[in-house]
Amino acid sequence: MPFLSTAHLCALLLILGCFYIGRLIKVIPILRFACAGEAEIKPLFIQPKSNDGIHLFVFLGSGGHTGEMLRLLQNHQEVLLNKRNTFYIGYSDDDSKARFLSMVEKYDFKAERIHFYPFAKAREVNAGPIASIVTISKTLLTGFTNVLSIKMNTLGQPHLTLLNGPGTCCIINFWLKLLEWLIYIPYLSNGSNVVYIESLARIESLSLTGKILYLLADVFVVQWEELKVRKAPRSEYYGILV
């Protein structure tokens, strides 16, 4: 006699299917928005419930994107640059890493509280279709190990992910959401907490990365009110942040 009859197996698959469909709705913000019919009101940054600080994953996307992210960190340093925080800094060029280190020198962080993760660029400027496919594939593969490491280190801890700008953010968000969907541990699995901040330069339309992460980021932030009204009703507007 088989361990599970066909009826039992079908019932088990049905239960698992319903569970993961429910998880998918919970994990993908645009699905929650579609089901609820209105945007969730969320604070911009998570507030730690203890004195241990938060685990903060920040991606520096090079050039102007890095500049905006560093200004964001400094403008909200009480929460984001708290000495009790643990930092996971993703970067795609050495200059961005150096700029971050230069910025945090005055805050006297302990070295063990800052962890760096190099990410390959998802797409180079003016790259052709074939070159883009190659770089995206490379970023998918190498990015997974970084995201998995960060995910496991922040499991069960108050944490926040800050993204802005480049296409690599889409890959980071993809892996975070996939792992959140697949890995469910009661009392430890507490979401990805991804905040995506659209560039200050985006006044009338979303960037390509923004259009993708509008569907996937837990909190999607625009810095111009007319952009929220015209193009991104699910987004949050807190004024100019950078």
UniProtKB/Swiss-Prot annotation:
Keyword Nucleus belongs to the record: yes
Membrane topology term: Single-pass membrane protein
Sorted UniProt keywords: Endoplasmic reticulum, Membrane, Nucleus, Transmembrane, Transmembrane helix
Cystine connections: none
Cellular component, GO annotation: cytoplasmic side of Golgi membrane; lipid droplet; nuclear membrane; UDP-N-acetylglucosamine transferase complex
Ranges in the topological domain labelled Cytoplasmic: 25-242
Subcellular location: Endoplasmic reticulum membrane; Nucleus membrane
A GO term, aspect molecular function: protein-membrane adaptor activity
Keyword Transmembrane: yes
Lumenal side: 1-6
Family: Belongs to the ALG14 family.
Subunit organization: Heterodimer with ALG13 to form a functional enzyme.
Job description of the protein: Involved in protein N-glycosylation. Essential for the second step of the dolichol-linked oligosaccharide pathway. Anchors the catalytic subunit ALG13 to the ER.
Name used for this protein in its record: UDP-N-acetylglucosamine transferase subunit ALG14
